[in-house]
Amino acid sequence: MNKSIVFSGAQPTGKLTIGNYIGSIRHWVEMQKHYQCIYCIVDLHSITVRNNLCSLHTRSLDTLALYLACGINPDISTIFIQSHVPEHSQLNWILNCYTYYGELNRMVQFKEKSSRYKNNINVGLFNYPILMASDILLYQTDFVPVGEDQRQHVELVRDIARRFNNIFGTVFKIPNVLISMYGSRIMSLLNPTRKMSKSDPDPNSYITLLDNVDCISKKIQGAVTDSDSPAAICFDPIKKPGISNLLAILSGISGQSILNLEESFQSKTYAQLKDVVIQELSCMLKDLQCRYISERSNEGKLNHILNVGSQKARMQAQITFKKVNELMGFYKES
């Protein structure tokens, strides 16, 4: 029996946080056992923000090496670079013509990013969700694992797919959202009401997968907690966002449930909680970093994985895009 298809992607920053790992990548690893997984390094999405384009190639390989170090297996999952499959961009233009301005204008993430990047509010940033729709719909995706902050984008993808299907018949599968109960949204260490982000101007607000032990210790020790006495270690994101964030991090890396952690820290201090988080994080990341160094040093292997992945992805993408092209009535090359 054919497995359901999961599609997910991340930008090639070359720098993933523990938020990326706990909220996304550890779930990607587990999903490989149950789904046909397609994981895309979305380099086209990444140019909506002004980064150093000269390093995009290097960052793409860094990101792949991190995926492998985390446990993504190219023998059972398809891993590829978005720009290597031109059907993404081609379908993007077609779906542009079946998406309304008002729909994009309601996207919360566009409003947040345009306020953050006031000198670069480009059309690509505005159209970002349509390219995301192309990414997902090309592969007849069943499930899209996303954080709560991306749910609105996937709902738009579903709306676009339904609209296209209503006009042309069933072309696209309507994807569903997969959201984990805990760990989908790891928050900033310094402002636990905001999502942890590697683009945060203060590096003490996040921990990357390549941070060393001293760096991890410093950042966790400086993480926001509470001033109540005696300490009350419980999961309550509204009343105790800092403590809840540390519990979510510890749960994500240790595999223990939030409930079990609450019980084990019932009579402990905030300092003791931080010490355990530091110990668990340092141990996990030390092993991961050793695997990363090994993978990143073999550039030939990385290139081979991407070449094979792109070929597999394009074969699937072309099936969908050919059907779309025929329905649109485009003149065929003779």
UniProtKB/Swiss-Prot annotation:
Function, as annotated: Catalyzes the attachment of tryptophan to tRNA(Trp).
Subunit structure: Homodimer.
A single MF term (Gene Ontology): tryptophan-tRNA ligase activity
Family: Belongs to the class-I aminoacyl-tRNA synthetase family.
UniProt main location, coarse: cytoplasm
Subcellular location: Cytoplasm
PANTHER family: TRYPTOPHAN--TRNA LIGASE, MITOCHONDRIAL
Top EC class, one word: ligase
Keyword annotations from UniProtKB, A to Z: Aminoacyl-tRNA synthetase, ATP-binding, Cytoplasm, Ligase, Nucleotide-binding, Protein biosynthesis
Record: residues binding ATP: 11-13, 19-20, 147-149, 186, 195-199
Catalysed reactions, semicolon-separated: tRNA(Trp) + L-tryptophan + ATP = L-tryptophyl-tRNA(Trp) + AMP + diphosphate + H(+)
Top-level taxon of the source organism: Bacteria
Pfam families in the record: tRNA-synt_1b
Annotated motif 'HIGH' region, positions: 12-20
GO terms (BP aspect): tryptophanyl-tRNA aminoacylation
UniProt EC number: 6.1.1.2
Any Gene Ontology CC annotation: cytosol
Name under which the protein is recorded: Tryptophan--tRNA ligase
Classification via InterPro entries: aa-tRNA-synth_I_CS, aa-tRNA-synth_Ic, Rossmann-like_a/b/a_fold, Trp-tRNA-ligase, Trp-tRNA-ligase_bac-type, Trp-tRNA_synthetase
Residue window of motif 'KMSKS' region: 195-199
Positions of L-tryptophan binding: 135
